[in-house]
From Swiss-Prot:
Entry EC number(s): 2.5.1.18
Keywords: Cytoplasm, Nucleus, Transferase
Assembly and oligomerization: Homodimer.
The protein's name: Glutathione S-transferase theta-2
Gene that encodes the chain: GSTT2
Enzyme class: transferase
Organism per entry: Homo sapiens (Human)
Location of the GST C-terminal domain: 88-224
Length: 244
């Protein structure tokens, strides 16, 4: 069997890997694991990834669980164009520099609006207003750092061409954008960066990858989202409790 990718396009890192694979013609068997239903906490999936996280890549007996590691693995295995993960040592270090910062400052911050507006209400939990306000402040600060430190006067986050850094960043920022946050308003450099990345990826691929998250507010309003499993319910309560 070929490579299998376990994912849910509601998940930002799942979308990053999906887009990368599609853009580069990498053959993958897609296995959808419904996060809202809690399928990532099922016994069957935990046998594949005991962390219960998405995305997860299975290449024969080899299982890989972190999106940045998966992207690097696929880039090297399929020898994708050099701009994604440069062979030049310093250019590659810039990609890693961003990915390290991304894990600390972006990854846990920009996903919170989904918990506030969709996932919390789905299980009858309201995130306190002061936590929502702190999250907005944290997002604004992270956007400023993203713009000043990583983008600067360059066209892309790690240099003159699109890299894995841009893909990871775009997908994370799309999460609150899909929920109505005007992240790029008043930030012309970031808005132009987004336009360049999306133009490179192509409108059709972006629409394909983003269609589920872009419709999630409508699904929540119409009450058409699935009911989380008991295992997922407990995990969701714990995740909401960890919102700073």
């Amino acid at each position: 069997m070929g490579l299998e990718l376990f994912l849910d396009l509601v998940s930002q890192p799942s979308r990053a890997v999906y887009i990368f694979a599609k853009k580069n013609g990498i053959p993958l068997e897609l296995r959808t694991v419904d996060l809202v239903k809690g399928q990532h906490k099922s016994k069957e999936f935990l046998q594949i990834n005991s962390l219960g996280k998405l995305p997860t890549l299975k290449d024969g007996d080899f299982i890989l669980t972190e999106s940045s590691a998966i992207l690097i693995y696929l880039s090297c295995k399929y020898q994708t164009p050099d701009h994604w993960y440069p062979s030049d040592l310093q250019a590659r270090a810039r990609v890693h520099e961003y990915l390290g910062w991304h894990a600390d400052c972006i990854r846990g911050t920009f996903g919170i609006p989904l918990w506030v507006q969709v996932l919390g209400p789905l299980i009858g939990v309201q995130v306190p207003k002061e936590k929502v306000e702190r999250n907005r402040t944290a997002m604004d600060q992270a956007l400023q750092w993203l713009e000043d430190k990583f983008l600067g006067d360059r066209p892309f986050l790690a240099g003159q061409q699109v890299t894995l850094a841009d893909l990871m960043a775009l997908e994370e920022l799309m999460q609150p954008v899909a929920l109505g946050y005007e992240l790029f308003e008043g930030r012309p450099r970031l808005a132009a960066w987004r336009g360049r990345v999306e133009a490179f990826l192509g409108a059709e691929l972006c629409q394909e990858a983003h269609s589920i998250i872009l419709s999630i507010l409508e699904q929540a309003a119409k009450k058409t989202l699935p009911t989380p499993s008991p295992e997922a319910y407990q995990a969701m309560l714990l995740r909401i409790a960890r919102i700073p």
